[in-house]
Amino acid sequence: MKRLLILAYDFPPYVSVGGLRPYAWYKYLKEFGVYPIVVTRQWGNKYGSELDYIAPSESTETIVEETECGTIIRTPYKPNLANRLMLKYGSNKFALLRKAITAFYELLQYPFFVGPKSGLYRGAKKYLKSNKIDAIIATGEPFVLFKYASALSRKFNVPWIADYRDPWTENKNRAELPFVRFWERHFMKNAAAMTTVSDFFKMKIGENISLPKTYIIPNGYNPDSVKAVEQTEQCSDVFRIAMTGSINEWHPYKSVISVFAEFVKETNPKIELNFFGINRSEEIQQFAIDNKLEHFIHTYPRMDNASLLENLCRHNVMLLFNDYSYMGTKIYDYLAIRRKIILCYGNDSEAMQLKDRYYPYSLPGKTALSTHLQEDCLNETKAGIVVQDKNHLLSVLTELYNEFSQNGFIECHSINTDKYSRKEGARQLAEMVGTKLS
């Protein structure tokens, strides 16, 4: 059986979309003839918020877990001074000092093995001194893991794979961009192969580096988690719409919430708009208060994927914002639980202005790549409605609410969703490690 060392900073129990991809590899690779060894950091859910990302680990020793799926090496984590100040005094104090310290470590972590993430390198290096493996894969971000994989590859003569969940240099500011571009090119020189989630990202990454052998392994949903909640029924007494994950600046969330508020005031329905684990909770809560919608709009903190799916299943409709050339990750869970999706928006003037101002990705004038991946997916799977603009949204809400009032649920007759399983992604990675790197 081939043995694959996986460098993954985000990993359960930390609640992170980025951790779901390597977790699926860990869970399913062995079924396809590859034994996974995950090197990550120790995580806790002490705060249930972003503070868990910088909280110190409970143990100062490396913890090794052997399970039926594989091996997990959890290295200790000690926050730097900036993070300790944040934990002790909160986000409003020492902001400039914390920013300077963070920038210092950001600069030094590439030429030197320093900073709070370097424990993964030391843990992997110790393991490799006494254990043989066939390949290394590092999943970014954080992209400093590419440095660790590159160094380990040279030291132990093992091929390494760079897994890009997102492009490395796309969203950097102008001052930082030349610096990270240099290091990206430097570390990728000895990569045996590259994986990423879409042809669009492959193209964007190729704008900065000479691409090695590249394989597209999309994101997806965890089939075991979905199976555990497949008998969960929709709510039948209140029409519930759910949205999960980050709300980005190019998302027309203000427009959508305003239309929702208009619908509530016009029809006085039994309806809820619920947000799970979002990054704009305070803003949306304040909007609800200002518009006397506290009983209709709610926000909930982050939760583990299994609990999130259980909650989503009790809703009738899933809200999805348009990410254009980028598929995102939340759409896969929506597809998996077979709840109707409403995509906002397909062609709304206000949304287009937000896209022009904030959207970080661009395509060349002539390309065969799609600029509406989520819309393509919904059309292929028949899983939802592409809402064209805010006027269309009002009519869609009316139609869906009428269907709910009549039936007590919303029908969803989606098809061809099985191919979006993360287990399929693990199979593709196993095939790559087993044959194409040999």
PLM regions and their residue ranges:
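N-terminal subdomain of nucleotide-sugar transferases
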Residues: 1-77, 193, 214, 263-266, ...
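A charged, aromatic-enriched C-terminal amphipathic alpha-helix characteristic of glycosyltransferases
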Residues: 386-395, 402-434
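Conserved nucleotide-sugar donor-binding subdomain of glycosyltransferases
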Residues: 83-135
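Nucleotide-activated donor-binding/catalytic signature segment of Leloir-type glycosyltransferases, i.e.
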Residues: 277, 282-309
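Carbohydrate-associated surface elements
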Residues: 200, 220
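Conserved donor-binding/catalytic core segment of Leloir-type glycosyltransferases
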Residues: 233-251, 257-258, 425
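Membrane-proximal helix-turn-helix segments that form the acceptor-binding/catalytic region
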Residues: 24, 111, 115-118, 122-125, ...
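Acidic donor-binding loop of glycosyltransferase active sites
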Residues: 192, 310-326, 339-343, 347
